[in-house]
Amino acid sequence: MTRWVQTFLLLVAVIRSYAEDSCPDVKVIGVGASDKLTILRGCPGIQGVPGPQGPAGPVGAKGFAGARGIPGDIGPTGLKGEQGYPGARGLKGEKGDPGVPVPGTAQNCKEWLDQGVTISGWYTIYTPNGLTLSVLCDMETDGGGWIVFQRRADGSVDFNRDWNSYKRGFGRKDSEFWLGNDNLHLLTATGNFQLRVDLTDFSDKSTYASYSNFSIAEESQSYTLSLRSFMGGDAGDSLSGHKNFSFSTKDRDNKSNCAHTFKGGWWYETCHYSNLNGLYLHGNHTSYANGVNWSTGRGYHYSYKVSEMKFRPQP
Protein backbone atom coordinates (compact mmCIF):
# COMPACT_ATOMS: atom_id res chain seq x y z
CA MET A 1 0.00 0.00 0.00
CA THR A 2 1.37 3.29 -0.92
CA ARG A 3 2.30 5.85 1.62
CA TRP A 4 -0.35 8.43 0.80
CA VAL A 5 -3.12 5.84 1.04
CA GLN A 6 -2.00 4.95 4.55
CA THR A 7 -2.08 8.63 5.51
CA PHE A 8 -5.58 9.06 4.11
CA LEU A 9 -6.98 6.10 6.03
CA LEU A 10 -5.46 7.35 9.25
CA LEU A 11 -7.03 10.79 8.75
CA VAL A 12 -10.47 9.24 8.20
CA ALA A 13 -10.17 7.23 11.40
CA VAL A 14 -9.29 10.31 13.42
CA ILE A 15 -12.18 12.32 11.93
CA ARG A 16 -14.58 9.47 12.67
CA SER A 17 -13.36 9.34 16.23
CA TYR A 18 -14.00 13.09 16.76
CA ALA A 19 -17.41 12.73 15.19
CA GLU A 20 -18.37 9.95 17.55
CA ASP A 21 -17.30 12.01 20.59
CA SER A 22 -18.71 15.42 19.61
CA CYS A 23 -21.82 14.55 17.58
CA PRO A 24 -25.02 13.20 19.06
CA ASP A 25 -26.21 9.62 18.75
CA VAL A 26 -29.09 8.60 16.43
CA LYS A 27 -31.68 6.48 18.19
CA VAL A 28 -34.62 4.61 16.60
CA ILE A 29 -37.61 3.89 18.83
CA GLY A 30 -40.47 1.54 17.92
CA VAL A 31 -41.02 -2.06 16.75
CA GLY A 32 -43.03 -1.82 13.57
CA ALA A 33 -42.06 0.09 10.52
CA SER A 34 -44.88 2.51 11.11
CA ASP A 35 -44.03 3.00 14.80
CA LYS A 36 -40.38 3.75 14.40
CA LEU A 37 -39.25 7.25 15.46
CA THR A 38 -35.84 8.57 14.93
CA ILE A 39 -34.48 10.81 17.71
CA LEU A 40 -31.45 12.92 16.96
CA ARG A 41 -29.66 14.49 19.94
CA GLY A 42 -28.12 17.78 18.97
CA CYS A 43 -24.70 19.04 19.86
CA PRO A 44 -24.31 21.47 22.83
CA GLY A 45 -24.66 25.06 21.79
CA ILE A 46 -22.30 27.94 22.48
CA GLN A 47 -22.49 29.29 26.08
CA GLY A 48 -24.86 32.21 26.24
CA VAL A 49 -24.25 35.71 27.68
CA PRO A 50 -24.79 35.90 31.52
CA GLY A 51 -28.18 37.29 32.46
CA PRO A 52 -28.67 40.46 34.61
CA GLN A 53 -28.00 40.27 38.39
CA GLY A 54 -31.02 39.28 40.42
CA PRO A 55 -32.34 41.30 43.41
CA ALA A 56 -30.64 40.94 46.82
CA GLY A 57 -32.04 38.23 49.01
CA PRO A 58 -33.43 38.88 52.54
CA VAL A 59 -31.01 39.66 55.41
CA GLY A 60 -29.80 36.51 57.04
CA ALA A 61 -30.03 35.74 60.76
CA LYS A 62 -27.44 37.39 63.06
CA GLY A 63 -24.50 35.14 63.64
CA PHE A 64 -23.06 34.17 66.98
CA ALA A 65 -20.71 36.64 68.73
CA GLY A 66 -17.11 35.90 68.12
CA ALA A 67 -14.59 35.21 70.82
CA ARG A 68 -13.48 38.26 72.90
CA GLY A 69 -10.27 39.71 71.66
CA ILE A 70 -7.17 40.35 73.70
CA PRO A 71 -7.42 43.67 75.67
CA GLY A 72 -5.50 46.46 74.11
CA ASP A 73 -2.92 48.62 75.83
CA ILE A 74 -4.14 51.30 78.30
CA GLY A 75 -4.45 54.63 76.60
CA PRO A 76 -2.89 57.85 77.93
CA THR A 77 -4.63 59.72 80.79
CA GLY A 78 -7.08 62.31 79.55
CA LEU A 79 -7.17 65.94 80.56
CA LYS A 80 -8.79 66.80 83.90
CA GLY A 81 -12.35 67.98 83.48
CA GLU A 82 -13.79 71.16 84.92
CA GLN A 83 -15.20 71.12 88.44
CA GLY A 84 -18.92 70.54 88.54
CA TYR A 85 -21.47 72.67 90.32
CA PRO A 86 -22.18 71.90 94.00
CA GLY A 87 -25.15 69.64 94.54
CA ALA A 88 -28.23 70.54 96.52
CA ARG A 89 -27.85 70.53 100.28
CA GLY A 90 -29.13 67.38 101.90
CA LEU A 91 -31.67 67.14 104.67
CA LYS A 92 -30.49 67.70 108.22
CA GLY A 93 -29.96 64.46 110.06
CA GLU A 94 -31.37 63.57 113.42
CA LYS A 95 -29.55 64.63 116.56
CA GLY A 96 -27.04 62.00 117.61
CA ASP A 97 -26.41 60.62 121.04
CA PRO A 98 -23.94 62.51 123.27
CA GLY A 99 -20.37 61.41 122.63
CA VAL A 100 -18.15 59.83 125.23
CA PRO A 101 -15.46 62.33 126.32
CA VAL A 102 -11.89 61.34 125.60
CA PRO A 103 -9.93 60.99 128.86
CA GLY A 104 -8.07 64.21 129.56
CA THR A 105 -10.55 66.34 127.56
CA ALA A 106 -14.05 67.67 128.27
CA GLN A 107 -16.82 69.69 126.64
CA ASN A 108 -17.99 71.24 129.89
CA CYS A 109 -17.12 71.40 133.58
CA LYS A 110 -19.48 68.53 134.41
CA GLU A 111 -17.38 66.22 132.24
CA TRP A 112 -14.24 67.34 134.08
CA LEU A 113 -16.02 66.59 137.35
CA ASP A 114 -16.97 63.12 136.09
CA GLN A 115 -13.29 62.50 135.35
CA GLY A 116 -12.36 63.20 138.95
CA VAL A 117 -11.53 66.93 138.86
CA THR A 118 -12.94 68.38 142.10
CA ILE A 119 -11.03 71.65 142.57
CA SER A 120 -12.66 74.86 141.29
CA GLY A 121 -10.57 76.83 138.80
CA TRP A 122 -9.95 77.63 135.15
CA TYR A 123 -9.99 74.63 132.80
CA THR A 124 -9.88 74.13 129.04
CA ILE A 125 -12.95 72.65 127.38
CA TYR A 126 -13.73 71.80 123.77
CA THR A 127 -16.66 73.65 122.22
CA PRO A 128 -19.11 71.77 119.92
CA ASN A 129 -17.26 73.13 116.85
CA GLY A 130 -13.95 71.71 118.08
CA LEU A 131 -12.33 74.88 119.40
CA THR A 132 -10.80 75.20 122.85
CA LEU A 133 -12.11 77.63 125.45
CA SER A 134 -10.83 78.46 128.92
CA VAL A 135 -13.67 78.57 131.48
CA LEU A 136 -14.06 78.93 135.24
CA CYS A 137 -15.41 75.67 136.69
CA ASP A 138 -17.27 75.75 140.01
CA MET A 139 -16.75 72.22 141.35
CA GLU A 140 -18.19 72.84 144.82
CA THR A 141 -21.60 74.52 144.67
CA ASP A 142 -24.58 72.13 144.74
CA GLY A 143 -22.58 69.15 143.48
CA GLY A 144 -20.30 71.12 141.15
CA GLY A 145 -19.79 70.94 137.39
CA TRP A 146 -20.84 74.56 136.68
CA ILE A 147 -19.45 76.83 133.93
CA VAL A 148 -19.34 80.35 135.40
CA PHE A 149 -20.07 82.93 132.67
CA GLN A 150 -20.64 86.10 134.75
CA ARG A 151 -18.86 87.25 137.90
CA ARG A 152 -18.92 90.48 139.89
CA ALA A 153 -16.68 90.68 142.96
CA ASP A 154 -14.89 94.01 143.48
CA GLY A 155 -15.85 96.59 140.85
CA SER A 156 -12.48 96.33 139.06
CA VAL A 157 -14.02 95.77 135.61
CA ASP A 158 -16.35 98.16 133.76
CA PHE A 159 -19.51 96.34 132.61
CA ASN A 160 -21.05 99.33 130.81
CA ARG A 161 -19.62 98.21 127.47
CA ASP A 162 -20.60 98.03 123.80
CA TRP A 163 -22.17 95.21 121.82
CA ASN A 164 -18.92 93.75 120.47
CA SER A 165 -17.38 93.57 123.95
CA TYR A 166 -20.32 91.53 125.24
CA LYS A 167 -20.23 89.45 122.05
CA ARG A 168 -16.57 88.46 122.49
CA GLY A 169 -16.35 88.54 126.28
CA PHE A 170 -14.19 90.66 128.56
CA GLY A 171 -12.74 90.99 132.05
CA ARG A 172 -10.10 89.37 134.24
CA LYS A 173 -9.82 85.75 135.31
CA ASP A 174 -8.85 86.67 138.86
CA SER A 175 -11.81 88.98 139.52
CA GLU A 176 -14.69 89.97 137.22
CA PHE A 177 -15.61 88.86 133.70
CA TRP A 178 -18.26 88.10 131.08
CA LEU A 179 -17.59 84.92 129.06
CA GLY A 180 -19.06 86.31 125.83
CA ASN A 181 -22.46 85.99 124.16
CA ASP A 182 -21.07 84.05 121.18
CA ASN A 183 -19.60 81.50 123.58
CA LEU A 184 -22.84 81.32 125.56
CA HIS A 185 -24.80 80.55 122.41
CA LEU A 186 -22.26 77.97 121.26
CA LEU A 187 -22.22 76.16 124.61
CA THR A 188 -26.00 76.12 125.14
CA ALA A 189 -27.25 75.58 121.56
CA THR A 190 -27.48 71.80 121.99
CA GLY A 191 -28.64 69.98 125.09
CA ASN A 192 -30.57 71.03 128.20
CA PHE A 193 -28.92 73.19 130.83
CA GLN A 194 -29.69 74.35 134.35
CA LEU A 195 -28.93 77.97 135.24
CA ARG A 196 -27.94 79.05 138.74
CA VAL A 197 -27.50 82.59 140.08
CA ASP A 198 -25.47 82.97 143.29
CA LEU A 199 -25.56 86.27 145.20
CA THR A 200 -23.59 87.43 148.24
CA ASP A 201 -24.31 90.73 150.00
CA PHE A 202 -21.87 92.87 151.97
CA SER A 203 -22.86 91.03 155.16
CA ASP A 204 -21.56 87.86 153.43
CA LYS A 205 -25.03 86.36 153.32
CA SER A 206 -25.44 84.13 150.27
CA THR A 207 -28.66 83.37 148.39
CA TYR A 208 -29.41 81.73 145.04
CA ALA A 209 -31.99 81.18 142.30
CA SER A 210 -32.19 78.24 139.88
CA TYR A 211 -33.83 77.82 136.44
CA SER A 212 -34.38 74.99 133.95
CA ASN A 213 -33.72 74.81 130.21
CA PHE A 214 -31.38 77.77 129.92
CA SER A 215 -30.00 78.79 126.51
CA ILE A 216 -28.88 81.86 124.58
CA ALA A 217 -29.84 82.42 120.93
CA GLU A 218 -27.40 83.42 118.19
CA GLU A 219 -26.45 86.99 117.36
CA SER A 220 -28.97 87.26 114.50
CA GLN A 221 -31.64 86.81 117.19
CA SER A 222 -29.98 89.35 119.50
CA TYR A 223 -28.81 86.68 121.97
CA THR A 224 -32.36 86.18 123.24
CA LEU A 225 -32.62 84.60 126.70
CA SER A 226 -34.52 81.30 126.98
CA LEU A 227 -35.68 79.76 130.27
CA ARG A 228 -38.40 77.25 131.07
CA SER A 229 -39.15 77.62 134.75
CA PHE A 230 -37.93 78.84 138.13
CA MET A 231 -36.73 75.80 140.08
CA GLY A 232 -36.42 77.53 143.46
CA GLY A 233 -33.96 79.43 145.61
CA ASP A 234 -34.05 81.87 148.54
CA ALA A 235 -33.09 84.83 146.33
CA GLY A 236 -36.50 84.65 144.67
CA ASP A 237 -37.30 84.78 140.97
CA SER A 238 -36.07 87.98 139.31
CA LEU A 239 -35.17 86.48 135.92
CA SER A 240 -38.27 84.70 134.57
CA GLY A 241 -39.64 88.12 133.67
CA HIS A 242 -36.71 88.51 131.23
CA LYS A 243 -37.11 85.29 129.26
CA ASN A 244 -37.54 85.74 125.51
CA PHE A 245 -36.04 89.23 125.78
CA SER A 246 -33.25 90.46 123.49
CA PHE A 247 -29.86 91.45 124.82
CA SER A 248 -29.12 95.19 124.79
CA THR A 249 -26.02 97.34 125.24
CA LYS A 250 -25.42 101.07 125.33
CA ASP A 251 -24.71 101.16 121.58
CA ARG A 252 -27.39 98.65 120.55
CA ASP A 253 -30.33 99.21 122.85
CA ASN A 254 -33.05 96.92 121.54
CA LYS A 255 -35.70 97.99 124.07
CA SER A 256 -36.64 101.34 125.63
CA ASN A 257 -33.09 102.68 126.01
CA CYS A 258 -32.72 100.56 129.16
CA ALA A 259 -29.02 99.70 128.73
CA HIS A 260 -28.11 103.38 128.60
CA THR A 261 -30.24 104.19 131.65
CA PHE A 262 -29.13 101.28 133.85
CA LYS A 263 -25.46 101.22 132.84
CA GLY A 264 -24.88 97.67 131.66
CA GLY A 265 -25.65 95.05 129.03
CA TRP A 266 -28.64 92.83 129.91
CA TRP A 267 -31.86 91.24 128.64
CA TYR A 268 -34.12 94.28 128.96
CA GLU A 269 -37.70 95.02 128.04
CA THR A 270 -39.23 97.94 130.05
CA CYS A 271 -36.87 97.78 131.88
CA HIS A 272 -35.79 95.07 134.41
CA TYR A 273 -36.49 92.89 137.45
CA SER A 274 -32.78 92.23 137.76
CA ASN A 275 -29.53 93.57 136.33
CA LEU A 276 -26.34 91.94 137.56
CA ASN A 277 -24.24 93.91 135.05
CA GLY A 278 -25.07 97.35 136.47
CA LEU A 279 -22.76 99.68 138.37
CA TYR A 280 -20.82 98.25 141.33
CA LEU A 281 -22.26 100.45 144.11
CA HIS A 282 -21.19 98.75 147.41
CA GLY A 283 -24.51 97.84 149.02
CA ASN A 284 -27.24 100.39 149.68
CA HIS A 285 -27.58 103.22 147.13
CA THR A 286 -30.05 106.03 146.64
CA SER A 287 -30.10 105.81 142.84
CA TYR A 288 -32.77 103.58 141.34
CA ALA A 289 -32.04 100.12 139.91
CA ASN A 290 -28.64 100.93 138.39
CA GLY A 291 -26.47 98.72 140.63
CA VAL A 292 -25.89 94.96 140.79
CA ASN A 293 -29.58 94.47 141.54
CA TRP A 294 -31.93 91.52 142.10
CA SER A 295 -35.35 92.91 142.93
CA THR A 296 -36.77 89.87 144.78
CA GLY A 297 -33.62 89.77 146.91
CA ARG A 298 -32.40 93.09 148.35
CA GLY A 299 -34.46 95.27 145.99
CA TYR A 300 -33.60 98.04 143.53
CA HIS A 301 -31.57 100.10 146.00
CA TYR A 302 -29.05 97.46 147.00
CA SER A 303 -26.01 96.45 144.95
CA TYR A 304 -24.59 93.00 145.75
CA LYS A 305 -20.97 92.35 146.67
CA VAL A 306 -20.63 89.14 144.62
CA SER A 307 -22.75 87.75 141.82
CA GLU A 308 -22.13 84.65 139.73
CA MET A 309 -24.20 83.26 136.87
CA LYS A 310 -23.39 79.67 135.92
CA PHE A 311 -24.83 76.67 134.06
CA ARG A 312 -24.33 72.91 133.72
CA PRO A 313 -26.06 70.01 131.94
CA GLN A 314 -29.47 69.49 133.45
CA PRO A 315 -29.64 66.36 135.65
Swiss-Prot record:
Principal cellular location given in the protein's record: secreted
Region of interest (Disordered), ranges: 75-99
Annotated a carbohydrate binding sites: T270, C271, H272
GO CC, alphabetical: collagen trimer; collagen-containing extracellular matrix; extracellular space
Keyword Glycoprotein carried by entry: yes
Localization of this protein: Secreted
Domain annotation Fibrinogen C-terminal: ranges: 100-315
Coiled-coil blocks: none
Function: May function in innate immunity through activation of the lectin complement pathway. Binds to GalNAc and GlcNAc carbohydrate moieties.
The protein's name: Ficolin-1-A
Protein species of origin: Xenopus laevis
